């Protein structure tokens, strides 16, 4: 089982479970989770649901700058790999390990949250996710100000040891990723 970020369909070799939209914590306030969720397009609410005015909020995720779909909402789909139970996201690779039974589910671009300004960067962290390289959006809904922004990730090759292996890594080049299963 895996989440295919940036797409609303599963590859042919996988079984569709549900589709939805990518959401994350509200980066403007402290608290909440740090992971992303694939929220179902048709939510159910418990009969024992809490009500009130104090909640931890989720924000829709949007593609950030540098993307062909800039400011568009990010779709997701939950897929089940037939007869494969182990899933692995490999950063900085476009293929799965050779000769060990791994199957490529999809190739993508490594992305993480953008926080907006320097004050936010010290207080907010999010997950790294592999967004399908053939990105699409959920609808024509756009947002330039609200929501959760994802940007491609690159290595920080500054020459002062921040990222030790430069080369082969390069600054200002988006890192690839592969989602594999076996």
Model-derived regions, located:
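Composition-driven recognition of glycine/serine/threonine/acidic- and proline-rich low-complexity segments
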Residues: 1-182
């Amino acid at each position: 089982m895996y989440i295919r970020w940036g797409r609303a369909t599963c590859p042919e070799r996988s079984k569709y479970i549900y589709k939805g939209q990518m959401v994350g914590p509200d980066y403007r306030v402290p608290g909440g989770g740090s992971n992303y969720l694939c929220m179902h397009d048709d939510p159910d609410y418990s009969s024992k649901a809490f009500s009130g005015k104090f909640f931890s909020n989720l924000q829709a995720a949007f593609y950030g700058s540098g993307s062909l779909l800039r400011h568009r909402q990010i779709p997701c789909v939950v897929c089940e790999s037939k007869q494969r139970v182990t899933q692995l996201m490999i950063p900085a690779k476009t293929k799965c390990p050779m000769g060990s039974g791994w199957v490529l589910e999809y190739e993508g671009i490594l992305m993480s949250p953008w926080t907006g300004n320097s004050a936010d960067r010290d207080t907010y962290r999010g997950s790294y996710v592999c967004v399908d390289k053939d990105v699409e959006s959920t609808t024509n809904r756009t947002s330039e100000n609200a929501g959760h922004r994802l940007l491609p990730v690159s290595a920080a090759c500054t020459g002062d040891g921040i990222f030790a292996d430069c080369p082969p890594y390069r600054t200002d080049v988006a890192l690839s990723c592969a989602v594999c299963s076996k």
